[in-house]
Swiss-Prot record:
Its EC number is 3.6.5.-. Mg(2+) binds at S173, T193. Its cofactor is Mg(2+). This is GTPase Obg. It comes from Persephonella marina (strain DSM 14350 / EX-H1).
Amino acid sequence: MRFIDKAKIHVKAGDGGNGCVAFRREKYVRMGGPSGGNGGKGGDVIIMADKSLKTLMDFRYKKHFKAENGQHGSGNNRHGRNGKDLIIKVPVGTVVKDAETGEILADLIYDGQKVVVAKGGRGGRGNAAFKTSTNQAPDYAEEGQPGEERWIELELKLIADIGIIGFPNAGKSTLISVLSKAKPKIADYPFTTLTPVLGVLQLDYGKSVVIADIPGLIEGASKGAGLGHEFLRHIERTKALIHMIDISDQRERDPIEAFEIINKELEKYSPELVKKPQIVVGNKIDMLSDRSLIEKLKKEFSKRGYPFVAVSLVTKEGLDQLIKLIAEVYEKISEKELIK
């Protein structure tokens, strides 16, 4: 599934209804008293998080949203009805910004959370509201105020339990297609995956783990190299990381060096990112001529405090061990969240 993680929309709140100029037509009431009602308030535009939504895809096709206007006042002191609020639903995890100023208006992190992004205009007062002891028959009323309008930027921080990181072509897309039903486009060149892909790994005991294939990082990503900032943004809300390394050709890049380069980019972007639990996965062992490398890497990463598993996504070797490790890490994360 292709994820669109940014959208720009225009919102316009409803205008307030106009106040009415009217007079009573009653017998024995000299000149008739003022009876113009007030206009109704315009509807607000509200953005609300909805857990059933997963993407910002709908905003590709519809970019303009307008709430209902307030109705005008009328005679016999009848006030206009308020305009209905317009509720725009977005996925949980959406950050709402003012597109012009960049100000964050809300970070919608739980289901049902709302933010008013454009307030409806106030209704105008009818002439009955202007009656005074010195002006018994005012012949004027107020117009309703226009509703607020502005451009809004929506940014979806992909919410997944575990993110798969690594250099382009480390095998991340293949892993997510093997672990889940997702079928990302896979080809043998860097930056094949240009948008994050979500996959779901079903565990034996009925639970499921949402895994995000984060597009390949490169050296300099924290400074915006390649599509660095776009990619790093997606990692922030994952609870743990699968760090994939291609160990088939050490002449091209040393596995330890590859691991350190990516981790340095994470740390430069946000020191919190490198504190996340990481499972290191050495991929493409079916292409290894010397398998002693697997034990060496296992010991090296163990010293650094990271679990290591070697796999071949072609032959499926090591996959069961990896799934078991993912389940263990997920359980630890879940236990910590329960304690919190």
